[in-house]
């Protein structure tokens, strides 16, 4: 188990849509960067506790990891209202252009001290795949199209699915699955892999008598040690193709409008990373303070802890909307921070007043 930091950036370059009766068609271009850095807990354990005492025989795993997925999505979406406007279902089909990727497939570096002989045993298994034409100038990428848009050989497809249902006039239920798909990396690839995955080296120390008594024998012993270390930690580099998932996520939630200005919600979130499942449950409160200002608060339970408090602020200036949301605010003050999310953005809306009038008119008709 390690401590990790997640950083996510979503930049929406273009998003527009139009309605045809009960159907909605959309098109969007979004740039996404998903980054995860894993810091091995055992690194801090051995630094503060050492490898002796109760840690004799303990297998320290210094499995530092780095994963970066940088893509640009071209999405076509469709949604439709059903059951008297109560149910809306939809989806988006996305062509995904891969721009940069660093994926750590294996990162085991295990260190053990034998409790009887005090010999050190080290096992290594490392495999990292990259394709970084935009970031790495050493690859000699001079094509401006590749630098801006990425290589056409690095691409894939994805899909988003979602639905919402108005259970009553005040309660809305929703569910969605996003970023299902894969990107295939065929250009500017680099693969670094252990030549002997899982190879083990045991170090029992050096017999000082060999060096004092026979310098030739001592030199040969040192060379043998060096050769063994090179065999265990040797890395091979090639340029094979590989693929990565889009790091899919799912959401299930409900929202209740207490009145026109206040609502409460519950959201179940889940994601998969490195063959592990990361769920989270969030309770939220949102209030509209006048026509300009909106505030929100949240409490989240996740694998990282039970003290995740979040706050949000939004300012509505006519067609311009500005917002900022942050969570795990307690962790930033008490010193046990593991993960913090900050989201901020700006929206410019078109035709909102006309749509709101049409929606209000439809509700008034349905109540008659």
Question: Which positions does each model-derived feature cover?
Answer:
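Subset of outer-membrane beta-barrel
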Residues: 1-368
């Amino acid at each position: 188990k390690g401590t990790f930091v997640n950083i996510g950036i979503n930049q929406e370059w273009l998003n527009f849509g139009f309605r045809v009766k009960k159907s909605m068609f959309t098109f969007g271009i979004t740039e996404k960067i998903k980054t995860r850095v894993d810091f091995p807990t055992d690194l801090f354990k051995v630094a503060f506790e050492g490898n002796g005492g109760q840690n004799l025989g303990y297998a320290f795993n210094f499995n530092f990891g780095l994963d970066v997925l940088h893509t640009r999505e071209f999405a076509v979406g469709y949604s439709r209202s059903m059951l008297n406007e109560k149910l809306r279902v939809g989806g988006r089909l996305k062509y995904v252009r891969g721009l940069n990727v660093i994926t750590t497939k294996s990162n085991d570096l295990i260190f053990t001290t034998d409790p009887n002989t005090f010999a050190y045993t080290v096992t290594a298994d490392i495999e990292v795949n990259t394709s970084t034409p935009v970031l790495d100038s050493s690859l000699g990428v001079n094509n401006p199209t590749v630098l801006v848009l990425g290589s056409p050989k690095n691409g894939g497809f994805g899909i988003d699915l979602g639905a919402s249902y108005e259970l009553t006039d005040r309660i809305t239920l929703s569910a969605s699955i996003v970023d299902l798909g894969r990107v295939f990396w065929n250009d500017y690839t680099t693969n670094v892999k252990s030549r002997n995955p899982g190879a083990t080296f045991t170090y029992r120390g050096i017999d000082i008598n060999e060096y004092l008594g026979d310098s030739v024998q001592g030199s040969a012993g040192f060379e043998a040690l060096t050769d063994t270390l090179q065999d265990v930690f040797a890395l091979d580099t090639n340029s094979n193709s590989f693929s990565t998932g889009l790091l899919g996520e799912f959401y299930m939630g409900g929202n209740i409008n207490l009145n026109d200005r206040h609502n409460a919600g519950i959201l179940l979130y889940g994601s998969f990373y490195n063959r592990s499942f990361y769920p989270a449950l969030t309770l939220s409160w949102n209030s509209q303070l006048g026509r300009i200002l909106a505030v929100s608060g949240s409490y989240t339970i996740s694998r990282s802890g039970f003290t995740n408090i979040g706050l949000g602020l939004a300012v509505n200036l006519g067609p311009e909307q500005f917002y900022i949301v942050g969570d795990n605010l307690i962790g930033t003050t008490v010193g046990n921070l593991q993960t913090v999310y900050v989201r901020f953005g700006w929206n410019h809306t078109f035709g909102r007043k006309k749509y709101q009038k049409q929606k209000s008119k439809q509700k008034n008709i349905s109540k008659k």
